[in-house]
Amino acid sequence: MSLLSKTRELNTLLQKHKGIAVDFKDVAQTISNVTVTNVFIVSRRGKILGSCLNELLKSERIKDMLEDRHIPREYTEELMNVKQTESNIDIDNELTVFPPENREVFLNSRTTIFPILGGGERLGTLVLGRVQDDFNENDLVLGEYAATVIGMEILREKHNEVEKEARDKAAITMAINSLSYSEKEAIEHIFEELGGTEGLLIASKVADRVGITRSVIVNALRKLESAGVIESRSLGMKGTFIKVKKDKFLDELEKNK
C-alpha cells in the first residue's frame, strides 16, 4: 500500500466522524493497520486514549496497563521529555514500549515516538512499536501526520468541553434565578437531605421539617427539571428519586446562598 493510500485510509476514518467525537480506539486501529505496528495514543498525563496491540498483548504488564487505562508515571515523564520524533528505539533504551523483562522475545523490536502537539502546547504522545523491521521514511511521514491529526481532534474535544461547561453554567444560573425565595430555600434543604447528587426524597418530610408547603417543593423541582438541571422520577409511596444532571449545580447553589 502506498503512502498516499495509507493517508487516505486515515482521512476516511476522520471524515466518518465529522461533527462528532472521534473514537481514538478506531484511530489506533487504523494506524496499526497501515503501519503494521502496536499503537498507543497517550494523553500528557499518561491516560491511554486509544490502543491497538498485537504482540504486546503477550505481556502481563501491558495487559495490566490496558486494564488501568494508564501507562506508568515514570514512562509518561520519559515520553513528555521527547520534544521531536525519535525513531527506531531498541529494546535496551528506556523509551522502548516493549517490556524489557521479555527482552529475548522482543530483541529486534523498534519503537518510534511522535509528540502530539496542538495550539502551541504538548497534548500527548503517539507511540508505535514493531517486533522487527525498522521504521522507514514513509512510516515517519505517516506517523507525524497521524500525530498532527490526533492533536487537532484533542483540541476540538477540549473546545467542545469548554463550550458545554459554559452552556451548563448559563442553564444553572438561569434555573437558580427563576426560583422564588421559598423555592430556593426548599431546594437547599432538599440537597442537604440527600447529601449528594442523587437520592430518594420524601417531599412531605422535608416540608414538615422546614415549615414550607409541599407545593413549593414540587414547583421548585419542576423548574429545575424543565431547565435540564435535574431529573426526577416518582416512586409512588416511596417518594421521588432525584438526580443532578449538571455537575456544577450544587457548587452554584452553595455560592447563591
UniProtKB/Swiss-Prot annotation:
GO terms for cellular component: cytoplasm. One of its GO terms (molecular function) is DNA binding. Coiled coil: none annotated. This is Global transcriptional regulator CodY. InterPro entries: CodY (IPR014154), GAF-like_dom_sf (IPR029016), GTP_trans_reg_CodY_C (IPR013198), Transc_reg_CodY_N (IPR010312), WH-like_DNA-bd_sf (IPR036388), WH_DNA-bd_sf (IPR036390). Belongs to the CodY family. Its main location: cytoplasm. Residues 1-155 are annotated as: GAF domain. GO terms for biological process: negative regulation of DNA-templated transcription. Residues 203-222 bind DNA. The gene is codY. Signal peptide: none annotated. It is found in: Cytoplasm.
